[in-house]
Each structure stands twice: as C-alpha cells, then as structure tokens.
C-alpha cells in the first residue's frame, strides 16, 4: 500500500541487474513524482471473482512493482464437512489491509464449527502488522491449517519484514511462492473476463474465460523469489 503496510509500496530498493528478475519494471523513483492528492476513504472490497486485467497486473511477479499499491487476497477454505468456500478481498489506501481484514473478520466465521484448511493466494507477502495478525490467528485457532502462497515478496531486504515472515512460519503457516500451476488455478477459480462497454456505454455480455497465458519470465521470477524466501526462512 502506498503508505500502509508500514509504507507498503511495491517498489523495492534497486540492486545489481544480475540479481533482478528479468522482467523487472521501472521503479517509481525513475519517473517524476506526481502531486499528492487526497485519497478517498479506505475500504476493503470483498467478492468472488477478480477482473482479468486486475489479476494480470496485481499478481505479476516482477520485483519493481510500480503502481501496485494494494493487496489482493484470494482464499479457499476447506472444512471437515466437505464444504469448500472461495472468495477474494482487495484493499484500498492506507488503513487495514486485505490480510488483516481476512484473518480478523472473515476467517473466524469459518472456524466456529471445527477444523479448517485454508489457502490464501496473495499478490504480495504481508507487512509486519499483517504478519502479526496472521500469527495471532494461528495461535488462537489450533485447528487451523494455513498455507500462504505469494506472487511477490514485499520489502524482503528489511530485517523487520524478514523476522515477521519467520514468525508466521513459527506459528505454523506454510509459506511459498506462486508457480505457474498456482496462476492457472487462481485464474480458473477466482478470475472473470473484463467488462467491455459498447459504443453506447452499455456492458456487453462477457465471453468465456480463456486459458491463462503466462507472461515472459514468470517461472524464472518465481524461482528468484523462491531463493529469496529460502534465505529468509533459514
């Protein structure tokens, strides 16, 4: 988040070119900074399907993630009664984040009736505060099995962030980076075609959702982040 998530801006410190994913985008610092404008009130958006263009942009696993100033969280909750629940949240602006909203307000509704296995696919790894919320949820709910699958690592060079990620795993969460198969799964289960307007501004009937087409270097960037995550969790 641009000033949330402890200053959660998806841009990260520049490093030597050989250490960067090959399709890294320009950092925000390279462009002229726009004038600051007042942001509308914060909100967490909840739904079942993400527009395809939003998914492709927000979940792209580049390192310099200019413009990606929000977090998307797609969740699957499986309970012992063979019920499966899916949905997604996205946050706006600078207050609570999607992770905190999910683990504080959404997930407890599913934990009142017994054990649950939860997988969250997030566009970026959690900030320090959200990591603390996740750890608290795990410690309160011993019957919760949690897996967090991340497209990118947020400010992974910061010692507080590294410690927060280790704290999540110590609390019982499985952390890993998204791979091609995960993108295909999320595309199939959480993404919908973009709304297209005709010449009169009326929404056209959406067509069928096509197959997920990976961007260049998706798998290579995933391996890059896997190595960084492994370093953090040692």
Q: Which residues fall in each region the model found?
A:
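Zinc-dependent deaminase catalytic domain
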Residues: 1-234
């Amino acid at each position: 988040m641009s000033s949330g998530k402890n200053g959660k801006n998806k841009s990260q410190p520049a490093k030597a070119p050989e250490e960067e994913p090959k399709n890294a985008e320009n950092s925000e610092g390279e462009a002229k900074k726009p004038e600051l404008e007042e942001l509308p009130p914060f909100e967490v958006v909840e739904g079942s399907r993400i527009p395809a263009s939003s998914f492709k942009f927000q979940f792209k696993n580049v390192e310099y993630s200019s413009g990606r100033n929000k977090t998307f969280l797609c969740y699957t909750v499986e309970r012992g009664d063979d019920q499966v629940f899916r949905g997604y949240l996205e946050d706006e602006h600078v207050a609570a984040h999607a992770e905190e909203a999910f683990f504080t307000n959404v997930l407890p509704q599913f934990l009142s009736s017994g054990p649950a296995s939860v997988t969250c696919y997030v566009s970026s790894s959690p900030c320090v505060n959200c990591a603390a919320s996740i750890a608290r949820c795990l410690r309160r709910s011993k019957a919760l099995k949690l897996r967090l699958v991340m497209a990118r690592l947020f400010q992974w060079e910061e010692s507080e962030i590294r410690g927060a990620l280790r704290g999540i795993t110590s609390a019982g969460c499985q952390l890993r980076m998204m791979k091609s198969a995960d993108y295909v799964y999320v595309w199939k289960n959480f993404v919908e075609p973009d709304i297209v307007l005709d010449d009169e501004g009326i929404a056209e009937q959406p067509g069928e959702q096509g197959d997920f087409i990976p961007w260049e270097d998706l798998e290579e960037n995933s391996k890059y982040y896997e190595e960084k995550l492994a370093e953090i969790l040692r």
